[in-house]
């Protein structure tokens, strides 16, 4: 499969300016989420999520977000490295902690700065956009976690990766470096197998996982607003046709593929426009896996 045949539907994307850091945007998103929930940093028990690509291999920059937000030292920081399902898994774990009586309010925050970590000789690179989003998870009668479902194809572990690698252009071999530090920096790669997985395994797995989750909970697709990974209009049109939700909301043309930030950003973007009984969020992720989260609105 040729990349150009897959990555269509993009009009614009957002890119961090020189000197901007994604952590600052994550903090802004978290502040908005706290404000909408009527909470202060002192009301938060745990911070879930992930910042990618982080400043260090470890610790994750989510710890720096903890500092910038002024969260109390008692707040547990839980980085979840599962691109791009980090937000969904954070919501799942946060909700389970609430149900178990271990916490009352958790913050789930994600940020992606991938535009600075792409190989722009590859077709998929121009679809990537930088973004940040956050949500508060606590006792509420809105957007209640109903159920979740995951399918993992770990045999495809090598297909989608972020690591240090040399790039090849016009007969030259280059090692990408960070413009600030001058040190080698990781870049994202989608192998030919990974591209074929998009047009095959992932293309088919998203509707299967989505419909299996709905069936398990006796929910009709017509009761659902759908949010998914947004990297290709062709794939999204296929998922819409197969799942047949009441509404299918995205911001691909406006924001591009925001990787792990896609889900909190789009949920916030359309929050006041969702009128269906349920919201279904389906994440495509490295590893390789597909995760679906069902919320009762």
What is each stretch, according to the model?
Residues 19-84, 88, 216-236:
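Conserved beta-ketoacyl condensing-enzyme motif
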Residues 1, 28, 88-161, 264-297:
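Conserved beta-strand-centric core segments of catalytic alpha/beta enzyme folds
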Residues 60-63, 120, 262:
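Generic recognition of short, well-ordered alpha-helical segments
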Residues 2-6, 56-70, 108-112, 180-181, ...:
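Acidic-glycine-rich active-site phosphate/pyrophosphate-binding loop
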Residues 24-34, 125-252:
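Hydrophobic pocket-lining "lid/loop/helix" segments that shape and contact the acyl-thioester
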Residues 27, 53-54, 72-74, 81-102, ...:
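Claisen-condensing/thiolase-fold acyl-transfer catalytic domains that form or cleave C-C bonds
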Residues 12, 44-48, 69-80, 116-119, ...:
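Glycine/charged-rich beta-loop-alpha catalytic/anionic-binding loops adjacent to active sites
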Residues 1-15:
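N-terminal amphipathic/basic leader segments beginning at the initiator methionine
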């Amino acid at each position: 499969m040729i990349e150009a045949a897959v990555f269509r539907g993009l009009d614009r994307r957002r890119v961090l300016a020189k000197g901007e850091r994604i952590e600052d945007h994550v903090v802004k998103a978290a502040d908005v989420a706290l404000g909408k929930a009527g909470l202060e940093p002192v009301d938060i028990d745990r911070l879930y999520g992930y910042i990618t690509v982080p400043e260090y291999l470890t610790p994750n920059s989510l710890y720096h977000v903890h500092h910038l937000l002024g969260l109390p030292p008692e707040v547990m920081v839980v980085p979840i490295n599962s691109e791009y399902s980090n937000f969904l898994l954070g919501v799942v774990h946060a909700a389970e902690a609430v149900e178990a009586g271990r916490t009352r309010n958790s913050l789930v925050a994600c940020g992606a700065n991938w535009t600075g970590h792409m190989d722009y000789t590859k077709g998929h690179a121009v679809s990537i956009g930088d973004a940040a989003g956050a949500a508060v998870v606590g006792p509420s009668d809105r957007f209640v976690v109903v159920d979740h479902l995951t399918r993992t194809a770990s045999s495809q572990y090598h297909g989608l990766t972020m690591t240090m690698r040399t790039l090849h252009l016009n007969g030259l071999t280059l090692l990408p470096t960070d413009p600030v530090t001058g040190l080698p920096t990781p870049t994202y790669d989608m192998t030919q197998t990974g591209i074929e997985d998009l047009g095959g395994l992932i293309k088919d797995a998203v509707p299967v996982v989505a419909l299996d989750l709905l069936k398990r909970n006796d929910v009709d697709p017509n009761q659902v607003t759908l949010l998914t990974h947004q990297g290709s209009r062709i794939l999204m049109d296929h998922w819409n046709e197969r799942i047949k939700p009441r509404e299918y909301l995205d911001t691909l043309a406006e924001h591009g593929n925001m990787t792990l930030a896609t889900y909190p950003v789009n949920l916030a973007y359309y929050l006041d426009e969702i009128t269906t009984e349920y919201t279904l969020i389906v994440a495509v992720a490295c590893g390789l896996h597909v995760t679906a989260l069902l919320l009762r609105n």
